[in-house]
């Protein structure tokens, strides 16, 4: 079983407009509301793929109830209730652009943070892999993911971390390391304080930096150019075919789902990397975020090339 953690979930609201007019009324006909947050995208893709998945995080208010009520019944909802209201994130789709308005989310108390920590420990009993995705809610310290990873490691669970900024830096500087991290080039550049490109030799060099010591897998997203990955002392380039993209939103989360599935099933390096990239591409071919059409899986799987470099 795979446990997905979304500490700062949201209701994602989409407003499609032919034109966004400022300082006046804009009327929307076709409004879409879905449970949002990176970890919930991971949950839905794992569910589409047929994995047994358990979802947790911090939710509150009517927005939190909406999330529970609108997840597929086959996803085991094990969320921790807090007093604040779960946030709403608005995407205005207009003239080929996407303007986003993102709420910060609720402020968690010390008691609520401690309560979730105990809740997390309880959920690990029947789990093989834990995914930790997205931003931390207000009130949680930057090193909170480090705390959860330590608990998971002590219980023999593999962890996949997909976050950025201070939360990622705190984990890299801490004593307990995740099994996998999945930065993109921009996040890698931010971590290292210098611009990184798709130069394989340069990537090889920086991924051997002591900053990443103790992390078994480092999987760097190169966008439409695939992936550059390091597993222990072996490096891989994953070459993906060109596809028609409907929406790339959530494709990174779908890739995380593939990584988690590969770890849960003890797959070899090439199988894990191929599955992860296929799921990311399948999500990009769909209008709905965090959804994959498995009818296209085998064809894409055969088109991906994993090379040791």
Curated annotation (Swiss-Prot):
InterPro entries the record matches: Carboh/pur_kinase_PfkB_CS, LacC, PfkB_dom, Ribokinase-like, Tagatose/fructose_Pkinase
EC code(s) of this entry: 2.7.1.144
Catalyzed chemical reaction(s): D-tagatofuranose 6-phosphate + ATP = D-tagatofuranose 1,6-bisphosphate + ADP + H(+)
Pathway: Carbohydrate metabolism; D-tagatose 6-phosphate degradation; D-glyceraldehyde 3-phosphate and glycerone phosphate from D-tagatose 6-phosphate: step 1/2
Pfam families: PfkB
Signal peptide segment: none
SUPFAM superfamilies assigned: Ribokinase-like
One annotated GO molecular function: phosphofructokinase activity
Keyword tags: ATP-binding, Kinase, Lactose metabolism, Nucleotide-binding, Transferase
Gene3D superfamilies linked: 3.40.1190.20
Keyword Magnesium set for record: no
Gene Ontology CC annotations of this record: cytosol
Broad EC category: transferase
Keyword GTP-binding: no
GO terms for biological process, alphabetical: D-tagatose 6-phosphate catabolic process; lactose catabolic process via tagatose-6-phosphate
Entry similarity comment: Belongs to the carbohydrate kinase PfkB family. LacC subfamily.
PANTHER family documented for this protein: 1-PHOSPHOFRUCTOKINASE (PTHR46566:SF5), 1-PHOSPHOFRUCTOKINASE-RELATED (PTHR46566)
UniProt-recorded name of the protein: Tagatose-6-phosphate kinase
